[in-house]
Amino acid sequence: MLTIEDIKKIIPHRYPFLLIDRLEELEDGKRAVGIKNVTVNEDFFNGHFPDYPVMPGVLIVEALAQVGACAILNVEENKGKLAFFAGIDNCRFKEQVKPGDQLRLEVEIVRMKGPVGKGRGVASVNGKTVAETDLMFAIK
C-alpha cells in the first residue's frame, strides 16, 4: 500500500486537487487501484450542491486519471515527467457519490505507444460501479 506521501512522490498534484488518499495496488506501467474517502468537508460540496452534496462526475474522472498517472509515471523512464489528459471516451456515470462514500478507483493501462497511453478506469462504491471511462494520457 502506498500512502499519500508516496503518491506525492509520483504525481505533482497537491491539495485541494489531489483526489486520491492511498494506493492499494500498483503495478508499474500496468494498473493501479486507489482509494478516495469522500468527506462532507470537501471544498466542492459547498457549491455542488449545498442542500444535496454530490461529488462532481468530472472529479471522479480526474481521480481515475490520477490513479492511472501513478501507474504510468512510476515506470523508471517516466519518473519526473508529467501525465496530461489527452482524451476521455465512453464515459458513463451510473450512481451518485456522496459524503461518507469510499471511492475505489481502478485503472488498467491498456496501451502505451511512445509518449501516449490509454487506460480503462472504473470507479466503484461498495462493489457497485459508479463511473467508468476510457482515458488517454500524454507524457511530457
UniProtKB/Swiss-Prot annotation:
It is found in: Cytoplasm. GO terms for biological process: fatty acid biosynthetic process; lipid A biosynthetic process. The active site is at H48. InterPro entries: FabA_FabZ, FabZ, HotDog_dom_sf. GO terms for molecular function: (3R)-hydroxyacyl-[acyl-carrier-protein] dehydratase activity. Keywords: Cytoplasm, Lipid A biosynthesis, Lipid biosynthesis, Lipid metabolism, Lyase. It catalyses: a (3R)-hydroxyacyl-[ACP] = a (2E)-enoyl-[ACP] + H2O. Its EC number is 4.2.1.59. It comes from the Bacteria. GO terms for cellular component: cytoplasm; membrane. NCBIfam families: fabZ, PRK00006.1. Involved in unsaturated fatty acids biosynthesis. Catalyzes the dehydration of short chain beta-hydroxyacyl-ACPs and long chain saturated and unsaturated beta-hydroxyacyl-ACPs. Belongs to the thioester dehydratase family. FabZ subfamily. PANTHER family: 3-HYDROXYACYL-[ACYL-CARRIER-PROTEIN] DEHYDRATASE. This is 3-hydroxyacyl-[acyl-carrier-protein] dehydratase FabZ. The lineage of its organism: Bacteria, Bacillati, Bacillota, Bacilli, Bacillales.
